From Swiss-Prot:
Span of the annotated motif OAR: 849-862
GO cellular component: nucleus
Alphabetical UniProt keywords: Developmental protein, DNA-binding, Homeobox, Nucleus, Transcription, Transcription regulation
Listed transmembrane segments: none
Stated name of the protein: Retinal homeobox protein Rx
KW Transcription (keyword) present: yes
Comp. bias (Pro residues): 683-694
Biased composition range(s): Basic residues: 224-235
Amino acid sequence: MSGSGGVANSSSTAAANNTAATFQHIFEQLVQQGGGNHKLPPKQLEQLRHLLGNVRDAKNLQMIVEKFKNLEQFHEHYAAHLANNNTVISTEDSNDLVKDNARKYGSGGQTLTPRHTIDAILGLKNRNGAANGSGRNPETVSDGSVDPSLGDDDATDLRCGMTLTQLRSMDNHMASMLQQHAKNGGALPYGPPTPPGGQQPQVPNATPLHHGQQMGGQAGHATHAGHGHPTHHGHAPFGYHNAFGFGQGGHGYGHPEEAAGNYLNSMHQMVEANQLQTGANGANPPPAPLPPSSFGSHQQHLAALAAQAQEQQNQHSKYAKSSPTGAGPPPPPGAYFMESQTAPVAPSQINYDERSMSSASDLEEDDDDAAKLQLDVTSPPTPSPRGQLAAKRKSAGVFCDDNEPKLANGQLPGGNYGIRPRSMEEVHHQQQSHHHQQQQQQQQQQQQLQQQQGFQHDFRNSGNGNPNGNSNSGDHGERLNADSDSLVNGSCASSEDLNQTNSSEQGEKITSGSDDEGQDDNCAKKKHRRNRTTFTTYQLHELERAFEKSHYPDVYSREELAMKVNLPEVRVQVWFQNRRAKWRRQEKSESLRLGLTHFTQLPHRLGCGASGLPVDPWLSPPLLSALPGFLSHPQTVYPSYLTPPLSLAPGNLTMSSLAAMGHHHAHNGPPPPHVGHGGHGQPQPPPPPPPHGVPHPHGSHHVVPLSHLSPHLSRMSPHATSLGSPHHGVTPLGTPLHSSLPPSSTATTVAVSSSQSSSSSASLECSGPDVCMSPQNLSIGNADSNGDGRDLSSDLDAGSTSSNPGSSLDKCAASANIELLDVGRDSPPPPPTPTGKGSSTPPTDMRSNSIATLRIKAKEHLDNLNKGMVSIV
C-alpha cells in the first residue's frame, strides 16, 4: 500500500492512472471479500470510488489509505463473523472511523487526556459493535455509551484496532494470571475488587453470561436491561466490558469517568467466574443459558437474560430487599452486584474471592491491607450519582454502611459472612480516614519543622487564613498528598494548596534566603516569567543621556523617552531603577577603593575597546561591534564615554569620568585629538589637528591606546570644556597654545571649532605637577542635553592656563559656582585631593567623600537653576 501511495504522489499521469487502477482493483477485491456490495453502504462505495478516480491528489491519497486500512480491518471482522447475517456496517461507523483515524494520524494533533489514554490502552472505546456481531439494526446506530457525542469526540477510538479474538485471548490470559495469583497466595494485588457502587460483582450471572454469551459475540447488552433503555442497543465492547457495569438505577452508562474501572471489573468478574466454575457444587447454581447462536435477535437475548435473572431472584427473594422488582425488566447486570443472587452461593464457596468472600476475621485484615495499598483500581475517578437502586439499597438495614461492624463481629443474620457490600460512602470514608492519618503524620512533621524554623514562613500561610500552615479538614488530605507530587513534577500548586507548606519547599525557601517571596511569587514566576529586555545601542545611548540629566526623571520624561526609544514606559522605569542601583554600587566601591589607596591607583572601570576606545561596561561585544558605524556618522553626537582617555603625569590626580553626559564634543567634529604624554611627564608635540569644520571619518584613530601608560594612570575620558560663546577668545583651530603657556606647564588646550557658531567645544587636557586638576576645572562648562554651551567667565580661561598654582587653585574654586557636576555619571568625581606639591589638603575618608560630592552637586545645581542654564524637561 505504501509503495502504491508513493507512485500516486508522482506527477506522471500514466503512473497516477496505473495507481488508480491498482487501488480500484484492491478496493473491489476487498469489497468482494467483505461480503459483496450489499454489506457496505452505497454512499461509502460511491465515495471511495470517487476518491479512487482522483488519486493524483495527495490529500485524497491520504484519505484513501486511511479508508483502505479501515476496509482491511473490516475484512478481519468479516472473517471472524461472516456466519452472522446480522452484521451491518453503518455509514456513521465508517465515517467515524475515517474521522478518528485522521485525528490520530493527521495534523490536528489533538491532545490526549488521561481518560482517553486509559480507554485506548484498555480497549474500552473499541465500539465497532457491528463487526463484533452485536446484531444491531442499521437504524439503531448510536453509541453504547448512551451519550453519542462522547464517542464521536474521542480521539483514541480503537474500534478497528483490535479484533474480538485478540481481546478475548488477552482477557483469558489476564484472567488466568489473576486466578493463578489468587490461588497461589492470597489477596489480589489490585486492592478490593468490590466496586464502589456498594455491591459485589454478581456471580451466578457472571459465569455463564461472561463466558457463554459474551465470548460468543452476543455482547452483553444486558447492561441496558435494567436501565429503561431496552431499545438502546449498546456496542459490543461496551457491553463486553460493562456487563455488570456502572449504569445504576434509572440512568445508563452516562459517566465517562467511570470507564477506567470497567475493564478491571470485568477482569475480577472473570476470575471469580472461573473459580466458581471449578467449585460449583454449591446450592442453587444458575440455569445454563442457551448458546449464543440460538438467540434469533437481540430482543430474545435480553428476554432470556431477564427470565434467568427473574428465576434467580425468585429463588432468593428473602435477600432481595434492595433490588427493584417492579420497574420493568429486573436489572441484574445493571449494577455491580445484586445481593439476592449471590447471597446463597457465598457460604458454600468461600474460595470465591479471598478478599471479599473471606471470614469475619479476614475482613478487617483485608480492609486494612486495602487501605495501605491505596490501589483501588476498580473505583471510578469520581463517585458517580446513584439512582433508585442506590436509594433502596441504602434503606435496607443489613446492606447499609453499618453492615461492616456487624460483619466483622459475626453478627450477620444467617451466619453469612461472605456478603459485605461496600457503598460509595464507605469507600470514601475509608480513603478519608487513611488520608487523615497521613495528614496527621505530615502535620506532626511540619510542626517539628516549624519549631526548628521559627516564624519565618508563618506570614505566607496567614495570607490564606491558615497561620500555622496546617489543615485539619479531611478534604485537604488529598491536597497534602498531591502537594509533594506537584512540586516534584514542577507544576504550580493551586491557591488552596498554599495552605499546606511543604517541608521541602520550606527548605528551599530558607536556603535561598528569599523570605520576602511566598509561594504565590513562585507560582507567578512560572506562569508570568517575562523575557529579559535586550536594549539596542541606540536605546542605551538615549537612556544614558537621560540618566545624565536626571537620576529621577518624572513620569512625563519617562513617557517621552519611552516613545523615543520605542520601549514601554515600565521598562524605562525599571532601567532607571537598575541604573541608579548600579551607580550607587559603583560610587560606593570607588569611594572605598579611592579611600584605601589614597588615590594612587584610580578605578579602572572604563576598559579599552578594540580600537583603543575606553567604553563603559554595558557596551558588551555585540554592542561594540555596532560602534564603528555609530562613530563614523558625521552628525553623531559623541558622549563622553567615547572620548579619548586622559593621560596624566604621576603626580597629578584625575577625577573619575562622568560618562554619558549630555554635553557634546562638537556637533559635527570628531573627538579632539589626544595629546599623548609619557609616563614621566615629558611633553610630546601634539599630532596635527583635523582640518577646520571637516569631521574626521575615523576620529577614533587619534585615540592613543592606554597600554603604554603607567599602571597608576587612570583610564578615563576627560571632561571637555565647552566654551559657550565666541567672545571667550578661543584660539583658532590648530593653533597650539604653547606660546601662551609658561615653560613649566605642559598643559595643552586644543580648541576645536564647531561648524555651528552657537557651540564650540574644547578639550582641556592638563598635565604636569603645577596645574591643579581639581574636579572643577575638569568638568567646567559641560554642555547640557540641548547642546548649548555654558557661559564661562573669561578669567576662568586665564586661570586654567596660569602658571601660578595658587591662582590656579583660586580660579578652580571660583569656577565651582558655575560648573555642573554630572548627576548621571556612574560615579561622582572625588573632591579636590592633595596633588604632587600644589596642595596640603589631607586625604578624606569615604563618608566625607560622598557627603562632599553631594554638597557640590546640590550647590552647583542650585546655581545653575538660578542662572537658568539647566532646562527642566
